[in-house]
């Protein structure tokens, strides 16, 4: 799997936009955009990316949640590349398939699991790629350093589910990827959330 952050270094307020392709650009690999953001320079970067001879530049789009900084360019992306569009929100226009917790998709050359993570928004999802132990987290709060917050039980269950995965790298909706001690970070966050739940019980 190859991952390119198409909005790295941008001056536009936008989410990260990840172009995920297969390592060898095989025909069966699914060239995938995770979020589309709102920076129009992504079009040139997509067009210049190595996505495989005779293949679509973008086979599919997965939207992590329906906020403008993550989904604004979706109509233009759809017009330019005619991808299939997956999202958890049934209210987002231009969606082909509404995904549910536990659904499996092919992303690049890997199998990816959809994890529903309500909290930041009711339609938030993470995307977990099993073979490379990679988690695309959108805006799901995964770095929780204290037990001062309040959390919905559905989010706690989602975080417990994520903590059961073998996660070695996290690609967030904003900022740089996390490559070190991801499992320990997630376990610490879960302990803080569980402590917060007990405090507010």
What are these regions (language model features)?
Residues 1-29:
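Short, compositionally biased "basic patch" segments
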Residues 2-6, 19-20, 102-129:
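Core dinuclear metal-dependent hydrolase active-site scaffold
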Residues 4, 62, 86, 97-99, ...:
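Hydrophobic/aromatic beta-strand patches that form the interior of the parallel beta-sheet core
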Residues 14, 93-99, 145-149:
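Short, charged, surface-exposed secondary-structure boundary motifs
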Residues 22-25, 89, 129:
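Short acidic, glycine-rich loop/turn motifs
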Residues 28-33, 38-40, 111-116, 122-200:
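Metallo-beta-lactamase
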Residues 30-31, 37-108:
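Active-site HxH/HxHxD metal-binding segment of metal-dependent hydrolases
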């Amino acid at each position: 799997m190859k991952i390119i952050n198409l909005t790295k270094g941008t001056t536009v307020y936008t989410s990260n936009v990840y172009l995920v392709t297969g390592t060898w650009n095989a025909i069966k690999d699914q060239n995938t955009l995770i979020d589309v953001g709102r920076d129009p320079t992504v079009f040139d970067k997509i067009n210049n990316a190595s996505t495989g001879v005779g293949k679509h530049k973008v086979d599919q789009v997965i939207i992590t949640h329906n906020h403008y900084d993550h989904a604004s360019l979706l109509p233009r992306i759809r017009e330019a590349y005619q991808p299939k569009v997956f999202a958890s929100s049934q209210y987002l226009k231009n969606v082909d398939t509404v995904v549910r917790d536990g659904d499996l998709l092919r992303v690049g050359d890997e199998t990816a699991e959809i994890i529903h993570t309500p909290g930041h928004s009711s339609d938030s999802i993470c995307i977990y790629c099993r073979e490379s132990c990679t988690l695309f987290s959108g805006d799901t709060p995964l770095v929780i350093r204290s037990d001062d917050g309040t959390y919905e039980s559905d989010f706690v269950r989602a975080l417990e589910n994520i903590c059961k995965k073998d996660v070695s790298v996290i690609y967030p909706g904003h900022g740089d990827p996390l490559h070190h001690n991801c499992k320990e970070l997630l376990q610490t966050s879960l302990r803080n959330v569980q402590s917060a739940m007990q405090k507010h019980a």
